[in-house]
Amino acid sequence: MTLEQAELSRLLDILGNRNRRRIIELLREKPCFVTEISERLTISPKAVIDHLQMLEDARILGFRNDARRRKYYYLEHDISIQVHL
């Protein structure tokens, strides 16, 4: 497996999770912090943090801190996937 194939496989694994896709859809609307994501999607804060970490590690998300030291997550890039079989 080439490096490009491995990266694509990892990205597809990350995006294969429904909750991560829901988080991405929510962040398309506006930047959000963990509690906001948790409440809007009815997912535990711990699960949200785990999903956000994976998305951040894949460079799909970024974050910024506000004055209250809350992390606001946002999409780094618009995501579009095309599959050719």
Name each model feature, range by range:
Residues 46:
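Key DNA-contact positions within bacterial/archaeal DNA-binding proteins
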